[in-house]
Each structure stands twice: as C-alpha cells, then as structure tokens.
Amino acid sequence: FQNIFQSYFISNFFLGLSFVIIWGIVIYMLNAEIGQETSEIPASWFSVLNSLFIILLAPVFSKIWASKYNPSGPIKFGIGLILLGVGYLFIAYGSLGIPAGAQTASVSVMWLVYAYLFHTLGELCLSPVGLSYVSKLAPERLIGLMFGIWLLSSAIANYLAGKTGSYIDAISSEIGLNGFFAIFALVPIGAGLIMFLLNGKIKKMMHGIK
C-alpha cells in the first residue's frame, strides 16, 4: 500500500485536498443554516441519502443475488417496483396533515428518509439487474444499441417525471398532496404485481438465461 501511495502521491494529495474542501463547504453550510434561530433543511439535501444507502446496501444485495435465494429477473423487477411504490406511500402518509392548496407546511424529515431508503432498495433491484439482463439477453451484435436504448429510456423517464411534477399544484388542489403521491405509489405497486403474474411467461421467453 505504501509503495502504491508513493507512486500516486500527487494524485492522492489533490484527491484528499478536494475532499477536505468539499467537506469544509458542507460543514460551513450546515453551520450557517442550523445556527440560525429558525432552521430550514431543503428537501434537495436528502438526495445524498441515495448514494449513502447504495454504498451500504449494495453488498447485501450482491450476497443475496449470489445465494440460493436469488429470485428470477422478472421477480426482481416486480420487487423493485413495489419497493418504489412503498417509498411513495411514506411520502403520501407524511403529507396527510397538509391541507389542499397549502403553500408551506412542516413534516417530519423521517418520511423523506424512509422514502429514499425504499426508493434505493427498489433501484438496487432494478438498475444493475436491468443492465445485466440487457447484456445477457440482447444479441451480441446489438448489445451496444440495447444499452443505448436502456439509457435513452432513463432519459425519457426523467423528462416525463419533470412534466408530471409540473401538475402537482393542479392535482393536489383537487385531491390533496397525499392523493398526488398516492398515485405514484399505486401505479408502480400495481405494475410490480403484474410482473409477478407474468413471471412464468417471461422466464420461458428468456430461454433459461438467469
């Protein structure tokens, strides 16, 4: 380790320095925000939880997928979709006390933590598994194209998510904010249950590829 560190001393030095700068900025922002008499934590700050949960939970999922309890691909997709829906259920439940048309409201930060946890669990069932099956199931000459289509579908999904989010005021004014998030909970849960029902048929179409 010492020889490797000395060989890449300059790069390691600047890498370590960059981490010190980043964490210095983070600590300064936290001190400036929380040091006030009234503190507000922006929801965007919680996005770091996704990376944290991935780092902590990815080894666990890797162990499960390598064990005898490894489910089939369609079942993994179904579980991932249901976990995604459960994450939105936490947000829907947490927003029950927010009246329709409210401009501001305060809720427990734990609802966002739970939501990010279950969304990350769902992501770990979907994203790496999907990429793996693209490489396994696509014809060899089309693997690059299929990976491109997979990433393109993610880009389209992000665009549609932005468009859908723009309707939050119109929908929440009619059925409340909890009703708006309940839609995003029920749709993926329903899709996950459909994946369970189609598991046998999809496995036959995979011709024994696991």
PLM feature segments, named:
Residues 89-93, 155-168, 193, 197:
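A gly/Pro-rich, aromatic-decorated transmembrane alpha-helix motif that marks the paired
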Residues 5-15, 66-84, 209:
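Cytoplasmic membrane-interface "Motif A"-like loop-to-helix N-cap segments
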Residues 79-82, 175-200:
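Symmetry-related core transmembrane helices of the 12-TM Major Facilitator Superfamily/SLC fold
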Residues 23-32, 82-104:
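C-terminal ends and interior cores of transmembrane alpha-helices
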Residues 47-54, 147-162:
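Glycine-rich segments within core transmembrane alpha-helices of 12-TM secondary carriers
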